[in-house]
From Swiss-Prot:
A matching Pfam family: V-set
Chief site of localization: secreted
Species for this entry: Homo sapiens
Segments of this protein annotated with the region Complementarity-determining-1: 45-52
Function, in words: V region of the variable domain of immunoglobulin heavy chains that participates in the antigen recognition. Immunoglobulins, also known as antibodies, are membrane-bound or secreted glycoproteins produced by B lymphocytes. In the recognition phase of humoral immunity, the membrane-bound immunoglobulins serve as receptors which, upon binding of a specific antigen, trigger the clonal expansion and differentiation of B lymphocytes into immunoglobulins-secreting plasma cells.
Subunit structure: Immunoglobulins are composed of two identical heavy chains and two identical light chains; disulfide-linked.
Protein name: Immunoglobulin heavy variable 1-58
Compartment list: Secreted; Cell membrane
Chain segments carrying region Framework-3: 78-115
Lineage start: Eukaryota, Metazoa, Chordata, Craniata, Vertebrata
Keyword Secreted recorded: yes
Keyword Signal attributed: yes
Signal peptide start and end residues: 1-19
Domain named Ig-like: residues: 20-117
Length: 117
């Protein structure tokens, strides 16, 4: 498995005191270096259009690393400089889903990726 490695995406969930806020992410992905991956984060239980969705990742034994965010209502994005050339964060308001696409994958991109709102 020299050229195949796993990028793992977990289910993220958040619970509010008086509401059921939930973010459900797409499942595990196995990709080859040089390809791209697009993962999703579906929101429910809160007003998606009034939120911002953040994406972070954590490689084994490393600290959380911020990738970027999108303001859902306006579509404005902000990316960490490290990922500027390789990441695109989008959203689909009709399905309350945010997406993070990472291109030109490298072995160093092997990590657990999380969304948060």
């Amino acid at each position: 498995m020299d050229w195949i490695w796993r990028i793992l995406f977990l289910v993220g969930a958040a619970t509010g005191a008086h509401s059921q806020m939930q973010l459900v992410q797409s499942g595990p992905e196995v990709k080859k270096p040089g390809t791209s991956v697009k993962v999703s984060c579906k929101a429910s239980g809160f007003t998606f259009t009034s939120s911002a969705v953040q994406w972070v990742r954590q490689a084994r034994g490393q600290r959380l690393e911020w990738i970027g965010w999108i303001v859902v209502g306006s579509g404005n994005t902000n990316y960490a400089q490290k990922f500027q050339e390789r990441v695109t964060i989008t959203r689909d308001m009709s399905t309350s889903t945010a997406y993070m696409e990472l291109s030109s994958l490298r072995s160093e991109d092997t990590a657990v990726y999380y969304c948060a709102a």
